[in-house]
């Protein structure tokens, strides 16, 4: 069996670490972006990588790319994930995204599970990594017989003091539109419970 193939959709700010990680571990990687030069920069001449042009507005162009891979990772803006998920479902491909699960993505996730596919969402720093690391800590404390009296998690693009040079006091590591949309999402927390 050959190397697993992964399609990365988008060559924005969060793509570089993922592309590098996958290539260093022997995966074949296709980076699809509207700006091929950015995808090429991410591949950086690696023999197991390939950069291709992809315009998300032409979603049918995704099908031949999906036909080549085992897994798609959508790093596109969150409002594009549903279109990608529909294509992955039609072509029986697993999907990973970094965004919250919208009702439409939830419905497609149920269909994917019924088809034996994994649609894994919320795998970004906001919200995924902080959730996973929190659960790891909580599980460890409970396994050692401890009890959680309180837990607070602060996560995001908080810059070092010397780099805190803008009115937002924030450093964009992902699409600014996505940051603004996420900032308007409702929040919930559990306190004293």
Mark where each language-model region is.
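N-terminal Rossmann-like NAD(P) cofactor-binding module of classical short-chain dehydrogenase/reductase
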Residues: 66, 70-75, 95-97
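Conserved Rossmann-fold cofactor-binding substructure of NAD(P)-dependent oxidoreductases
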Residues: 55-68
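Rossmann-like dinucleotide-binding core of oxidoreductases
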Residues: 117-193
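ADP-ribose/adenylate-binding Rossmann-like module
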Residues: 87-105
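Conserved N-terminal Rossmann-fold NAD(P)-binding element of oxidoreductases
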Residues: 6-10
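Rossmann-fold NAD(P)-binding glycine/threonine-rich loop
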Residues: 99-121
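N-terminal Rossmann-fold NAD(P) dinucleotide-binding loop
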Residues: 15-16
């Amino acid at each position: 069996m050959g190397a697993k193939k992964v399609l990365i959709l988008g060559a924005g700010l969060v793509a570089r670490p993922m592309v590098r990680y996958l290539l260093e571990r022997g995966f074949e990687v296709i980076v699809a972006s509207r700006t091929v030069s950015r995808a090429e920069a991410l591949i950086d001449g690696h023999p197991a990588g390939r950069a291709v042009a992809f315009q998300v507005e032409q979603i049918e162009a995704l099908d031949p790319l999906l036909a080549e891979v085992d897994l798609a990772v959508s790093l596109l803006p969150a409002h594009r994930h549903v279109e990608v998920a529909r294509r992955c479902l039609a072509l029986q491909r697993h999907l990973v995204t970094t965004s919250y699960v919208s009702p439409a993505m939830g419905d497609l996730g149920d269909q994917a599970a019924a088809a034996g596919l994994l649609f894994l969402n919320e795998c970004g720093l906001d919200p995924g990594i902080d959730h996973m690391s929190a659960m790891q800590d909580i599980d460890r404390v409970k396994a050692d017989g401890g009890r959680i009296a309180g837990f607070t998690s602060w996560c995001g693009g908080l810059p070092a003091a010397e780099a805190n040079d803008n009115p937002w006091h924030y450093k964009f590591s992902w699409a600014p539109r996505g940051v603004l949309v996420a900032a308007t999402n409702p929040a919930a927390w559990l306190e004293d419970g």
